[in-house]
Amino acid sequence: MKKNIARRAAGLVRDHNMVFINSGSTAFLLLNFLADANVTILTNNGRSIFKKPSTKASVVISGGEIFEQKKSLVGDFAINSFSKARADICFLGVGGISKNGISTYALPETAVNRVILERTTGHRIIVTEGFKVGRDSNFHTADCNMITHLITDHTADPETIAYLKSIGVKVLFIS
């Protein structure tokens, strides 16, 4: 399911885009589908250093303190890296998304995710499996009006989907 979500998300990226990708596992899979794209990717996903080098895409790792639980890069260095760039499009994996907002399990990641959203001028996209839609995780990252798209599957909570559509979020379902 995650792979199909990532494949659908990659289809929204255009040549020469600057792309932010957070440390979420679904967002991480995007790297596979963008390897041959003519883009620049900035990520705080520590696992990205183990990916096969891309033939076209330029992958920049944010730096920062390693948050061992998620293999993500967090803290001032990570925040500073994203603060000094501006993206055309961003992709965030989340712990939950509901009427209460976007949330994550990891407190150190909330500030990085917020900066990713704030520094993106175009599409701000949540990529997540349906069971996380309608669910709140431990730490609030941002309100739902900060995002433009949600890519998920048909198991997503219908009430949350209706709410997101009512505030202008475009919802894309994968099979």
Where in the sequence are the language-model features?
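HTH-adjacent hinge/linker in prokaryotic transcriptional regulators
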Residues: 1-25, 31-36, 52-57
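Short, contiguous clusters of charged residues that form electrostatic/catalytic patches at enzyme active sites
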Residues: 3-7, 11, 28, 76, ...
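Conserved phosphate- and dinucleotide-binding cores of soluble alpha/beta proteins
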Residues: 42, 46-175
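Short glycine/serine/threonine-rich phosphate/pyrophosphate-binding segments
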Residues: 27-30, 134-136
